[in-house]
């Protein structure tokens, strides 16, 4: 089928880590997941092939990065690259949990800044925008010049905990670095706040 020039098209693609989440997002937006042929060769290499034309389309590539993180990163990068080479108009890489986010700076000499490398890889692959949720540190947004949307799920958690637990409750940060987030969460919950001091 040949589409009219100028007709807008949005396509949502999912990696293999959490297709259920991507499917729910697609249904909320009144669409279905775009078809992708994903296989793995005997040597572990990933093969990707888009099953429909994406020319001129606004494409979103969703992948949750937990479990086999290195595999899921590579799979999402290949999806982004395939879309770029197939003339997608705009590509948004959606990473609900940003991989390597805790490695956002050098703590010791001769260490990589892995979170920066991940961002660079997605931009190099062809992503026009990155979307993530509740980053470990907000500075990750500054690693790239392209738009980087940092969303928060805090209102959802606040509502859930307010319904689930009776007052008073205390929000504990596992370290000093998380105190700001814990304080914001506690303020929205009208709760106490504390943190664990690591030696």
Tell where the protein language model's regions lie, with residue ranges.
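PRPP-associated nucleotide enzymes
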Residues: 1-199
